[in-house]
Amino acid sequence: MVQTGSCGASFYWQGQMTANGETFNPEGLTAAHKTLPFDTKVRVTNPDNGKSITVRINDRGPFIDGRCLDLSRAAFAEIASLDLGHIEVRYEVLG
């Protein structure tokens, strides 16, 4: 069974260590999620324009109500303008 859903997504860019021990790379196609296992691939789609990106979970968060994903700056920019800050997305856990 494929896990899918909708939620808010934002982006972050600090150059800290991620929860799995990697140095955060704002240009990598990665994301933070509260519970998905590290290295899980997730397809994230912006329903407003149909653009999608596949990211790898390597961090924990976001810690803002209503949001389930924090995308790297590069991943967010692939599906929406950075000026928006956060958007509603559809997601599909690929494994």
Model-derived regions, located:
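Secreted/periplasmic proteins
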Residues: 1-95
